[in-house]
């Protein structure tokens, strides 16, 4: 006969909701401070690097790239991958772009990008740079969702992306909203900090006054 355990409903709900919230925050909604990417963005770049969809090569259909990401790395539906890729291309929303869409990319006035079957994409030179030293010796790798291949948990950071491009996302009970900052100011602030890790906040604010 199975043993029946007595538990407190409050404790059980708290534990389950906490685990779910952490999973959503870590695996879907929020960026990692180390490379500045959400999981779907990181997987898009990884797929493009693996398939040599780089700035110097011919662009491929967005539909092909979305299918590859969904089938191998990110089983959360094609629309979330397409939306993320279009957002990564939007120069009017990002200080630095990692992908470049060829075709109707949408507009600053709110026009939508064309359907994924009509437009093509490849990495920008900055996107290419994330392939530099992308190996298990440099960054941690884990098995993908069906354990058929490996994927990086973070990308080798080439820029302080989280500050430069900002981020927004809503998880379960957690949200983030970080504005974009001027890339030159951010890089100069990082250089100043590496030269003097006791630099004051006021001194850093003189170099990087605020969002851009």
Residue map of PLM features:
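Catalytic phosphate-handling regions of large nucleic-acid enzymes and associated NTPases
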Residues: 1-212
């Amino acid at each position: 006969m199975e043993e029946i355990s007595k538990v407190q409903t409050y404790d059980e709900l708290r534990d389950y909701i906490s685990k779910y919230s952490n999973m959503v925050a870590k695996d879907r909604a929020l960026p990692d401070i180390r490379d500045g990417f959400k999981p779907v963005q990181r997987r898009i770049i990884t797929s493009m690097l693996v398939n040599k969809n780089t700035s110097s090569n011919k662009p491929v259909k967005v539909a092909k790239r979305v299918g590859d990401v969904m089938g191998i790395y990110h089983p959360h539906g094609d629309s979330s991958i397409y939306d993320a890729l279009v957002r990564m291309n939007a120069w009017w929303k990002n200080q630095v772009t990692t992908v470049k869409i060829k075709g109707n990319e949408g507009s600053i006035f709110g026009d939508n990008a064309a359907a994924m079957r009509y437009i093509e994409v490849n990495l920008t030179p900055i996107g290419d740079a994330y392939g530099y030293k992308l190996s298990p010796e440099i960054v941690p790798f884990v098995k993908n969702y069906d354990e058929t291949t490996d994927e990086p948990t973070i990308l080798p950071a080439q820029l302080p992306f989280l500050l430069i491009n900002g981020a927004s996302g809503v998880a379960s009970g957690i949200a983030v909203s970080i504005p974009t900052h001027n890339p030159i100011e951010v890089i100069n602030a990082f250089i100043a900090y590496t030269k003097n890790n006791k630099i004051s906040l006021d001194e850093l604010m003189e170099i990087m006054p605020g969002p851009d």
